[in-house]
Amino acid sequence: MRTSTVILLACLIPLSSWGQAVVTTFGIQVKPVIPFTYLDSKVNLERAHVTSSIELDGGYAFGMCVRVALTKTIALETGLGQIQRRYSFTLNNDTANYSETAKVRYIGYELPITALIFIRLGERAFMNAALGFSADFYPSDAQRDVERGRIYMFRNRWAQLGVIGNLGVEYRTVKSGTFYLGATFHRPFNALSTVDVTYYGSNFFPYPVRGSLSGAYLTADLRYYFHEDPAKRIRKKTKKKKD
């Protein structure tokens, strides 16, 4: 009986300490997309006399985030954001001496959930690493017409999953919230899009080339978390219990 009591207390003590430490904070974020050669960001397509290349050359993401601190070193984070990938593409026909360059945007929405681990660097400075998954949503296809051609990006799925990893540092002020700087890697499990680039000859006969885009990207993350006073929340809970 005594052994069972000790085991029960050992299980309840960590749970109670977790419950006391839970703090939820809300934040906003802006994430410029960084072109990176090693992320399969460029695709080359070709057929007889027609060549094309599509390359991720930037973009940005923005949205809101919610962080739930379970302990002083562990937290969960989720949110909702929009991502605009900007691609540049070229279309060439060597027999017609034709060359064209243009840009096209591909818009998506993301619902991530990650687990974070914090390492204290100073009195108010922390480093964190995060790993998790994201549900990615694509509302429509994208296209861009040029003088003698067209690029059309077909969404392969309206929703799919991806893996995300994050590394950053943050500074927690006394009453002015938390300022965060970091980087995020996002890679869908499946190809983002099937892309058709078409050259139209003098008789408007189409000469298409086709490929797929991985959709992987890297961002520089700028975030701000609004101030949340844990002591104030505890006082509110205590007051409710008394009432």
Model-derived features: positions:
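Positively charged n-region of N-terminal signal peptides that target proteins for export
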Residues: M1-S4, Q20
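Sec-dependent N-terminal signal peptides
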Residues: S4-P14
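Residue-level detector of alpha-helical transmembrane segments in integral membrane proteins
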Residues: I7-L9, I28, R105
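Short glycine/proline- and aromatic-enriched beta-strand/turn motifs that initiate or cap beta-hairpins
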Residues: G19-C65, R223-R233, D243
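Hydrophobic, lipid-facing positions within transmembrane beta-strands of outer-membrane proteins
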Residues: F26, G58-M64, Y109-I113, M127, ...
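Gram-negative (and chloroplast) outer-membrane scaffold detector with strong preference
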Residues: V30, I34-F36, R67-R144, T173-K175, ...
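Extracellular/periplasm-exposed beta-strand and loop segments of Gram-negative cell-envelope proteins
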Residues: F36-D57, Q84-G108, D136-Q160, A191-Y200, ...
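Predominantly the C-terminal beta-signal and adjacent terminal strand-loop region
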Residues: W158-Q160, G165-D243
